[in-house]
């Protein structure tokens, strides 16, 4: 059996679940400034495939890179790490 190649795995917060079987995940990370060396926080949104519509807005989720599923979707939901607190 061949082993699957290394894939990008990100942890982020769901900011939108309005689409069917698709969630938008905000991933925040730090990047070092090339000249000054200060860590700068930046964020990026990824669309991810959620087959069973499990994730809701505010959930912390893990997403993994996969083959292109649409024009903008290149990730799929692996697991919901933490459910959002509903007040």
Swiss-Prot record:
Cited Pfam families: Ribosomal_S17
GO molecular function list: rRNA binding; structural constituent of ribosome
Top-level taxon: Bacteria
A GO biological process held by the record: translation
GO cellular component entries: cytosolic small ribosomal subunit
Quaternary context: Part of the 30S ribosomal subunit.
Known function: One of the primary rRNA binding proteins, it binds specifically to the 5'-end of 16S ribosomal RNA.
Name of the protein described by the UniProt record: Small ribosomal subunit protein uS17
Organism, as annotated: Geobacillus kaustophilus (strain HTA426)
Lineage, broadest ranks: Bacteria, Bacillati, Bacillota, Bacilli, Bacillales
């Amino acid at each position: 059996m061949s082993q699957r190649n290394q894939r990008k795995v990100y942890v982020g917060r769901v900011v939108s679940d309005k689409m069917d079987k698709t969630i938008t995940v905000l991933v925040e990370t730090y990047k070092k400034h090339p000249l000054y060396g200060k860590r700068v926080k930046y964020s990026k949104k990824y669309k991810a495939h959620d087959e069973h519509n499990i994730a809701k807005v505010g959930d912390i989720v893990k997403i993994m890179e996969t083959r292109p599923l649409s024009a903008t979707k290149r990730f799929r939901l692996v697991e919901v790490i933490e459910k959002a607190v509903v007040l």
